[in-house]
């Protein structure tokens, strides 16, 4: 047997960074990202030899240090470090300092944000809640889009739904807007920041929106309009990206060593 799939199991081999990118973009094309987003190779060399990939949600100092320690040649994150127009890269600011550190250590940097939300995260999250009769919450391209709506596995109280979300996504807590004894049968789930999804979810007629980063006014307004909201936090649902991409790369590119950031909330509640 020849090729990557036929190489000896347990051994890792160098690949061009571009080869890895092509395999990722075959499954998660960049054109499915929202127009405001910044995805793809954000720093580094497409011809660089890579044998280790480090996967994380964000390119924090801790993540970059771990990527360096692991010997990674490619850092793969969900959230892009660079969003707006970057006019300079210097050690005088936080973003520039991190980019310099990556480049100095020979680590290319790739972000896959809303293209992954559209083509991976939404269905994965809906599946973890056992939603049925699912539909796209807000279309982006070719019938694919952000979030999903569907029927919960059973009718339950809003409080029970909150506990269900905590259990399925391994969360210590969630915030709930709405009466805890309200019965819910349908839900919209939109991982990440869900304020912009409140209106589409309300128009879809679901009983509860499950998302993150719901501000005070959006939460109380939606509850007053009859749609409950469960705020699982920005990280709370999106952390599933790390393990999902690990499985994807291990299956698609078994010659690579895949390392991941630990799954934990980036803050503490005291």
Residue ranges: model-predicted function:
Residues 3, 7-270:
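Hydrophobic structural segments
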């Amino acid at each position: 047997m020849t090729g990557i799939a036929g190489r000896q199991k347990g051994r890792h081999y160098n690949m061009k960074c571009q080869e890895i990118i092509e395999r990722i973009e075959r499954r998660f094309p960049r054109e499915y990202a929202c127009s405001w987003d910044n995805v793809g190779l954000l720093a580094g060399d497409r011809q660089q030899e890579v044998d280790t990939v480090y996967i994380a949600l964000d390119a924090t100092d801790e993540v970059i240090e771990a990527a360096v320690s692991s010997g990674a040649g490619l850092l793969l994150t969900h959230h892009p470090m660079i969003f707006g127009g970057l006019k300079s890269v210097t050690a005088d600011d936080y973003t520039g300092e991190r980019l310099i550190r990556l480049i100095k250590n020979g680590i290319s940097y790739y972000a896959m944000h809303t293209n992954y939300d559209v083509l991976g995260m939404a269905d994965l999250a809906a599946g973890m809640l056992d939603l049925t009769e699912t539909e796209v919450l807000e279309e982006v391209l070719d019938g694919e889009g952000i979030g999903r709506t569907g029927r919960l596995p059973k009718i339950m109280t809003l409080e029970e739904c909150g506990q269900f979300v905590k259990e399925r996504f391994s969360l210590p807590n969630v915030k709930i807007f709405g009466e805890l004894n309200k019965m819910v049968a349908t839900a919209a789930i939109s991982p990440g920041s869900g304020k912009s999804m409140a209106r589409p979810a309300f128009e879809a007629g679901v009983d509860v929106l499950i998302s993150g980063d719901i501000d005070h006014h959006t939460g109380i307004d939606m509850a007053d309009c009859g749609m409950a909201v469960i705020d699982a936090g920005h990280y709370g649902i999106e952390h599933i990206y790390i393990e999902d991409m690990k499985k994807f790369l291990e299956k698609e590119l078994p010659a690579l060593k895949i390392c991941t950031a630990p799954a934990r909330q980036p803050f503490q509640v005291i």
